[in-house]
């Protein structure tokens, strides 16, 4: 059908990327893909590119009316090797223009975490794309809307180039032997 664009969750991309070779159809044109709904492993980007797909990862929530971050390609990355390109592509990205502000902040003191790619904080969003509250649930609204920010519950780091990368959902962190272990890191190994 000569499609040029489609959207699919990482699980769909994984199914396409791991289709047996004898069932794969060779594309003679590039297909652009938007993926969201979960943090995709970097290997998916590499495999999809080999099949002729150009994948962009975006991030958003129901509470933010669509995506608020996009992993927009930076031409400085053109010189990187394919593994490095795939790793960068798996990040959630930078603020989408329709969103007033997105930061990775320490929820305890509401300070922005350093752009070091290591310090974990919570993704917080504000702007006219953020919901006003949960329908008939004042407690949930009060818990998620504090200090003028929507608290996403997603734990992330901010890289030196300003790109945000999710490490886990706060409720999915595994604590073992006093260490915080990311369920996403386990899934990606």
Predicted ranges, named:
Residues 1, 10-12, 19, 181-189:
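ATP-dependent adenylate-forming carboxylate-activation enzymes
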Residues 3-8, 17-87, 100-101, 110, ...:
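Gly/Ser/Thr-rich phosphate-binding loop
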Residues 6, 127, 132-133, 155-189:
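AMP-binding/adenylate-forming catalytic core of the ANL superfamily
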Residues 8, 40, 125-126, 136:
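A conserved hydrophobic position in a structured secondary element of the catalytic/binding core
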Residues 11-13, 40, 130:
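Alpha-helix capping/helix-boundary segments
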Residues 37, 60, 93, 154, ...:
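Active-site glycine-centered loops adjacent to acidic/histidine catalytic or metal-binding residues
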Residues 83-89, 129-153, 170-171, 183-187:
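Conserved ANL (AMP-binding/adenylate-forming) active-site segment centered on the GW(Y/F)…HTG consensus within
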Residues 95, 101-124, 160-161:
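Conserved beta-loop-beta connector loops within the AMP-binding
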